[in-house]
Amino acid sequence: MNKLQQRIASLLKSLNQGIYEKENETALALLAALAGESILLLGPPGVAKSMVARCLKHAFVEAQSFEYLMSRFSTPDEIFGPVSISKLKTDDQYVRVTDGYLPSADVVFLDEIWKAGPAIQNSLLTVLNEKLFRNGHTEEHLPLKLLVAASNELPAKGEGLEALWDRFLIRVICHNIENEETFQQMLVDETIGFADGGAKSEPLSEAITDLEYTLWQKESRNLPLTNDVLLAISSIRQKVQHVQMADLELPRNIYISDRRWKHIIRLLKMSAYIHGCKSVEAPLLLPLFHCLWNEPDEIPHVQRIVIEAIFSPVAVSYTHLTLP
């Protein structure tokens, strides 16, 4: 394990204090943040989705956070900040006061994301895709490192939510604690972790600076993809377009946009960078299935496709071995 891997592992251990059986979600959220992507946590109320989001603030030095519970009546003012009355009166400019709201935050948590109205959705598309917010006549570059969205349901069909859904590169289904001993430990644990607002006076020693964040992204994007990885990705892409579901006569086409594939590559490059690899290698493709499903019933099929694409070439190479 290289030094960066050790540091990230230590950071994740600290962040997960007081959170149970959410190590996978926290690790994926941190990977999304480092790659400049966003994550959607899908699951019923009370499964620690918000705790995962809150702890991520402490992964970064002096990070600011913003969280909001969406409703059908939420307004852009509540998310992006109120309109400055003084600017409107003196300069005749429609400018928002963004301090303390989403445009000023490093880590954002939006609960019940699909309840956002069209005006909020449109602004979020630009925020997620370009890290920009149009404030009056000015485009503001946002400090945003991670946006975590949560919901207990999939986006409704026919309501124009497809574009926003596509912006969340990683999608994870969250569950209640499954291990009985872990559940009992959670019941008696009175430790206040970062996710409960128990932030220590001193920042975590492993926390990531803005300079490191920028440098890691720049260096990771220079990593090449091996030919095996390109072949595996092509195989996965072709197979997800023809997935045979048990209850359907015709294969299902799991739609993955070209833009999504491009962002997936950035995610894989960051994973390779953290692992100290000189290039993106086939074993690092395993988390891909978190990026390639649109309906929960597709997950096991996508998992199988990804695993086959990674390990089939290895199996084939073994068949050509000759005994001494």
Where are these regions (language model features)?
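Conserved Walker
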Residues: 20, 42-45, 68-69, 89-99, ...
